[in-house]
Amino acid sequence: MERTMTPIKAAIIGSGNIGTDLMIKILRTGSGIEMGALVGVDPASDGLERARRLGVFTTHEGLDGLRRSPIYKDIGIVFDATSAKAHERHAEQLRQDGKRAIDLTPAAVGPYIVPVVNLEENLNAVNVNMVTCGGQATIPIVAAVARVAPVPYAEIVASIASRSAGPGTRANIDEFTETTARAIEVVGGARRGKAIIVLNPAEPPLIMRDTVYCLALTQDQDAVRRSIHDMIDRVRGYVPGYRLKQEVQFEPLRDARAVGGEEDGPALKVSVFLEVEGAGHYLPSYAGNLDIMTSAALAVAERFARTLIEENA
């Protein structure tokens, strides 16, 4: 007789754009995971109001309010979509309470996670960090290049619609660049990484666009191209709006040192141009920067949930 598996209940701290979009995704498409609570600090926020209409438990008293609620004992996974400073406070309390934390801020208390690159080796982590929207969009490309050739240097430029950048994003610009650059190295495999974010004020708003530059110590363009296309297909498994804007560009170099590399010998400058269109669950389609964060976080939560369900079976 087949056993019915009970989904893992999740709570989301942060009732802004990211938290609300994540809630809608879980309600519509979540696998092995279900909404338990949406937590905010403003009782009149659109996110909390929408959650109440959808029958989701809410509190406007932050993490303390969630911890006092009767539903807290049933929560297995907690998403934090607040701010880096707030998550630093939340992380220790969640750890003490035995809750798995998925951090959507740049706090980086736990290991960086990009689902298609390093999720499987971090399934036992109690707190994981989703890097940044720019990191989720570009680190898979850096990793795709790095798995076929050494990458002494990688640089990314993330351009997002100004209208999609809420107060949390704007308050965390410095943390965004620092966290993304570090994750390009730690997760992407580049020896040195650099990140730039651009808030595009264009009206009507443009969808997220990302540029990735890698210095690769190889001349095998076909191997690099195949690896990049394979990685893009894998990311599209959870972010359907993720795509190449144009074909991968290569510039052969006689000597890597001419462009800042430490090794002599032939190399390639690899340029990859991406765009990310949002699914439109709660946010407009131009907010691909927010959609890729919530989609990646949900992919991590679903994998964690399968692990927890198997352990409880």
UniProtKB/Swiss-Prot annotation:
Q: Does the keyword Ligase apply?
A: no
Q: Which UniProt keywords apply?
A: Aromatic hydrocarbons catabolism, NAD, Oxidoreductase
Q: Where is the active site?
A: 133
InterPro entries the record matches: Acetaldehyde_dehydrogenase, Acetylaldehyde_DH_C, NAD(P)-bd_dom_sf, Semialdehyde_DH_NAD-bd
Q: Output the superkingdom of the source species.
A: Bacteria
Q: Is Iron included in the keywords of this UniProt record?
A: no
Q: Which reaction does it catalyse?
A: acetaldehyde + NAD(+) + CoA = acetyl-CoA + NADH + H(+)
A Gene Ontology biological process noted in the UniProt record is: catabolic process
Short name of any one Pfam family annotated for the protein: AcetDehyd-dimer
Identify the residues that bind NAD(+).
Answer: 15-18, 164-172, 289
| Enzyme Commission identifier(s) | 1.2.1.10
- Which Gene Ontology MF annotations are present? acetaldehyde dehydrogenase (acetylating) activity; NAD binding
Q: Which Gene3D superfamilies match?
A: Dihydrodipicolinate Reductase, domain 2, NAD(P)-binding Rossmann-like Domain
State the similarity comment: Belongs to the acetaldehyde dehydrogenase family.
Output this protein's name: Acetaldehyde dehydrogenase
| Provenance organism | Rhizobium rhizogenes (strain K84 / ATCC BAA-868)
Organism phylogeny:
Bacteria, Pseudomonadati, Pseudomonadota, Alphaproteobacteria, Hyphomicrobiales
